Amino acid sequence: MSLLEAAPKRLGGFGLEGTRAMRANKVYDKLAFLVGITVVSAVVTMPMVSRSTSLQKLIVPAMLLALGCSLAGTFKPALAQKVAPVYALLQGVVLGAISKAYATAVGSSIVPMAIVATAAIFVGCLVVFRSGLVKVTPKFVGMISIASIALFACYMASMLGLNIPGIRDIGGGRAMIFGVIGLAIGIGSLFIDFDRVQKMETNEQMSNSVEWYLSFQLLISLVMVYLNVLRILASSQSRR
């Protein structure tokens, strides 16, 4: 996330072809397009994943490819325009499978509840940021970055076989703790992304490819928020 601080100094990282002033509304238009791809992909995947064993075998590869796209688009901003739609498509497959698992375990209503909650969190965070109540400082960025890396390391360690209690649970107290931590990081990431948009918009030398980079980063943050909202809702219902 500290990439934001370096971006204005590394204009070549985005490419200056067809340069024009970046506008925030263009970023959010592209975000809506990417979210649309993700939602369609997830909706198509959900009813198929329980019936097709071949599709189930593709979930982990799709997850790894989506991770690769997210890293490529984050550390090579000029690639964001190409990898963002691919990431959205792959992440939709992953989210569809995960959402189906939660719907089966807890109830089908959990998915629309999580979608509405995610949208409300996004709008709420944007309103709070624009009101000036939250200031994105280097210390804030550093804290969210460290927390993100730590949580990512925990998930990777779990995938490699390390037993971390609660990290894979759908519901329960430990899953709730991981969900709250993940949601806090996701919300912090949204604030950082909003700050990026605001800062980039004032730099008229930036290429319009920055819009794709910023919308891509916003999508990654939204995915994190949605997944952790699912965990929190599932944990809340399992404790009743």
Give residue ranges: language-model regions.
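A hydrophobic alpha-helical transmembrane-helix feature that marks the membrane cores
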Residues: 1-240
